[in-house]
Amino acid sequence: SEKLILKIQKERICFDDLSNRNILLDLISFFNYEIAMFLDADEYLDVRFSNLSSYLSDNRLAYLIPMVNLWDSEKMFNAEYPYSISGISPRYRMFRNFGHCQIQSSKRLHFQQVPCVQNATVASEILVLHSGMLTDEMRKQKFERYLKEDTENCQSSYEHIRPKKCPKLRSVEEITQEELYNLNIR
């Protein structure tokens, strides 16, 4: 199947993730697509769990994509990440084309990144690896950026990414198809 990757660059006034995603939604409205997924520059698909085509024929409008935050190694992830299930965080990131749409949120940060959440399920054949907190230095930069940029208190705390934290880690290789499938049951 064909893939289209869109990247935008705009003048940065402040970190406004909502505006960025809505600009991308404006752009993709000119294309005939079946499903779309938001992936950030520091995120990539685990090759074992990257079957996007399995979602082309169902009737779901939105999908929660399992995601892990890599920590100190590309082979390990933070198993104690807040709002996760053993370190796996299902996030709204993939959705079906239903015409021009926008994400509605009162927050600029930490919102559901799809225009519609009705008729949703976990995409258990996909796993996103987030490398944005891989090193202590990266976590320090992210921690400081969020403290500065999150003027609306979109998230109650960023202590979980504070530098020098030593959470319990799990191997990415330990994640099984069954574990991802069981995210739908919870």
What do these predicted regions represent?
Residues 1-14:
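Acidic donor-binding segment of Leloir-type glycosyltransferases
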Residues 17-22, 44-186:
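Catalytic-site signature of metal-activated, phosphate-bearing donor transferases
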